[in-house]
Protein backbone atom coordinates (compact mmCIF):
# COMPACT_ATOMS: atom_id res chain seq x y z
CA UNK A 1 0.00 0.00 0.00
CA UNK A 2 2.82 2.38 0.92
CA UNK A 3 4.57 1.65 -2.38
CA UNK A 4 1.33 2.31 -4.29
CA UNK A 5 0.90 5.70 -2.59
CA UNK A 6 4.49 6.71 -3.30
CA UNK A 7 4.35 5.75 -6.97
CA UNK A 8 0.94 7.38 -7.58
CA UNK A 9 1.20 10.36 -5.23
CA UNK A 10 1.06 13.02 -7.95
CA UNK A 11 -1.89 11.40 -9.68
CA UNK A 12 -3.80 11.02 -6.40
CA UNK A 13 -3.02 14.60 -5.42
CA UNK A 14 -4.25 15.91 -8.79
CA UNK A 15 -7.42 13.80 -8.53
CA UNK A 16 -8.14 15.04 -5.00
CA UNK A 17 -7.58 18.64 -6.05
CA UNK A 18 -9.85 18.25 -9.08
CA UNK A 19 -12.63 16.69 -7.04
CA UNK A 20 -12.42 19.41 -4.39
CA UNK A 21 -12.59 22.14 -7.04
CA UNK A 22 -15.64 20.57 -8.65
CA UNK A 23 -17.34 20.00 -5.31
CA UNK A 24 -16.73 23.54 -4.09
CA UNK A 25 -18.12 25.07 -7.29
CA UNK A 26 -21.52 23.63 -6.39
CA UNK A 27 -21.63 25.78 -3.26
CA UNK A 28 -20.79 29.08 -4.94
CA UNK A 29 -24.10 30.65 -5.92
CA UNK A 30 -23.27 34.34 -6.26
CA UNK A 31 -24.79 35.89 -9.35
CA UNK A 32 -26.51 39.03 -10.54
CA UNK A 33 -30.08 38.29 -9.43
CA UNK A 34 -33.25 40.36 -9.36
CA UNK A 35 -35.02 39.83 -6.03
CA UNK A 36 -38.36 41.62 -6.26
CA UNK A 37 -39.46 43.90 -3.46
CA UNK A 38 -42.76 45.59 -2.69
CA UNK A 39 -42.42 47.74 0.39
CA UNK A 40 -44.67 50.14 2.25
CA UNK A 41 -42.56 53.17 3.10
CA UNK A 42 -43.87 54.61 6.39
CA UNK A 43 -44.76 58.26 6.90
CA UNK A 44 -42.15 60.67 8.21
CA UNK A 45 -38.67 59.26 7.93
CA UNK A 46 -39.65 55.71 8.84
CA UNK A 47 -37.72 52.80 7.35
CA UNK A 48 -38.89 49.70 5.49
CA UNK A 49 -36.91 46.51 4.93
CA UNK A 50 -36.90 43.74 2.35
CA UNK A 51 -36.54 40.06 3.12
CA UNK A 52 -32.96 39.21 3.89
CA UNK A 53 -30.53 37.30 1.69
CA UNK A 54 -27.16 35.75 2.43
CA UNK A 55 -24.25 37.84 1.15
CA UNK A 56 -21.60 35.15 0.92
CA UNK A 57 -18.75 37.28 -0.36
CA UNK A 58 -16.08 38.85 1.81
CA UNK A 59 -15.13 41.26 -0.99
CA UNK A 60 -16.51 44.69 -0.18
CA UNK A 61 -15.99 45.67 -3.83
CA UNK A 62 -18.57 43.06 -4.92
CA UNK A 63 -21.44 45.51 -5.43
CA UNK A 64 -25.03 45.19 -4.33
CA UNK A 65 -27.77 46.46 -6.62
CA UNK A 66 -31.06 48.32 -6.35
CA UNK A 67 -33.52 49.35 -9.07
CA UNK A 68 -36.48 51.48 -7.94
CA UNK A 69 -39.04 50.76 -10.65
CA UNK A 70 -42.31 52.16 -9.25
CA UNK A 71 -43.36 54.51 -6.48
CA UNK A 72 -46.87 55.50 -5.41
CA UNK A 73 -45.38 58.88 -4.47
CA UNK A 74 -45.01 59.58 -8.19
CA UNK A 75 -42.64 59.34 -11.14
CA UNK A 76 -39.09 60.48 -10.58
CA UNK A 77 -39.36 60.34 -6.79
CA UNK A 78 -36.13 59.78 -4.86
CA UNK A 79 -35.69 57.19 -2.12
CA UNK A 80 -32.70 56.53 0.15
CA UNK A 81 -31.38 52.94 0.15
CA UNK A 82 -28.69 51.01 2.02
CA UNK A 83 -27.89 47.48 3.13
CA UNK A 84 -28.29 46.38 6.73
CA UNK A 85 -26.69 43.44 8.49
CA UNK A 86 -29.76 41.65 9.88
CA UNK A 87 -27.71 39.76 12.46
CA UNK A 88 -25.97 42.75 14.06
CA UNK A 89 -28.21 45.23 15.85
CA UNK A 90 -25.28 47.29 17.20
CA UNK A 91 -23.68 48.07 13.82
CA UNK A 92 -26.44 47.33 11.32
CA UNK A 93 -25.32 49.40 8.31
CA UNK A 94 -23.61 47.16 5.78
CA UNK A 95 -23.17 49.98 3.24
CA UNK A 96 -23.30 53.73 2.86
CA UNK A 97 -26.66 55.33 2.11
CA UNK A 98 -27.54 56.18 -1.50
CA UNK A 99 -30.31 58.23 -3.08
CA UNK A 100 -31.94 56.51 -6.05
CA UNK A 101 -34.40 58.10 -8.45
CA UNK A 102 -37.43 56.08 -9.52
CA UNK A 103 -37.16 54.90 -13.12
CA UNK A 104 -33.41 55.51 -13.42
CA UNK A 105 -32.45 51.84 -13.77
CA UNK A 106 -30.16 49.63 -11.73
CA UNK A 107 -27.61 51.24 -9.42
CA UNK A 108 -24.59 49.34 -8.08
CA UNK A 109 -22.89 50.17 -4.77
CA UNK A 110 -20.14 48.72 -2.59
CA UNK A 111 -20.84 47.20 0.80
CA UNK A 112 -18.65 47.55 3.88
CA UNK A 113 -17.18 44.81 6.07
CA UNK A 114 -20.44 44.56 8.07
CA UNK A 115 -21.95 43.10 4.89
CA UNK A 116 -19.38 40.32 4.50
CA UNK A 117 -20.47 36.68 4.73
CA UNK A 118 -23.73 37.47 6.53
CA UNK A 119 -27.44 37.98 6.03
CA UNK A 120 -28.33 41.43 4.74
CA UNK A 121 -31.55 43.19 3.79
CA UNK A 122 -32.35 46.22 1.67
CA UNK A 123 -33.36 49.21 3.79
CA UNK A 124 -35.27 52.19 2.40
CA UNK A 125 -36.36 55.58 3.68
CA UNK A 126 -38.09 58.52 2.05
CA UNK A 127 -35.49 61.19 1.30
CA UNK A 128 -37.89 63.92 2.43
CA UNK A 129 -40.51 64.18 5.15
CA UNK A 130 -43.90 62.82 4.12
CA UNK A 131 -47.16 62.82 6.09
CA UNK A 132 -48.37 59.62 4.41
CA UNK A 133 -47.14 56.11 3.67
CA UNK A 134 -46.90 54.69 0.16
CA UNK A 135 -45.76 51.61 -1.71
CA UNK A 136 -42.67 51.13 -3.83
CA UNK A 137 -41.63 48.30 -6.16
CA UNK A 138 -38.35 47.23 -7.66
CA UNK A 139 -35.57 44.67 -7.63
CA UNK A 140 -32.38 44.29 -5.62
CA UNK A 141 -29.47 41.90 -5.19
CA UNK A 142 -27.13 41.48 -2.23
CA UNK A 143 -24.09 40.75 -4.45
CA UNK A 144 -23.68 40.80 -8.20
CA UNK A 145 -20.60 38.71 -9.00
Curated annotation (Swiss-Prot):
Pfam families cross-referenced by the UniProt entry: DUF2712
Domain of life: Bacteria
Protein name: Uncharacterized protein YybN
Organism: Bacillus subtilis (strain 168)
Lineage: Bacteria, Bacillati, Bacillota, Bacilli, Bacillales
Amino acid sequence: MNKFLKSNFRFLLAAALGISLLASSNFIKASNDNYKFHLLVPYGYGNAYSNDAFRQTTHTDNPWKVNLQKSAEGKGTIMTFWLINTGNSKIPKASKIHNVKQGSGAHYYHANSQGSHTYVALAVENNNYSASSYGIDGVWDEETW
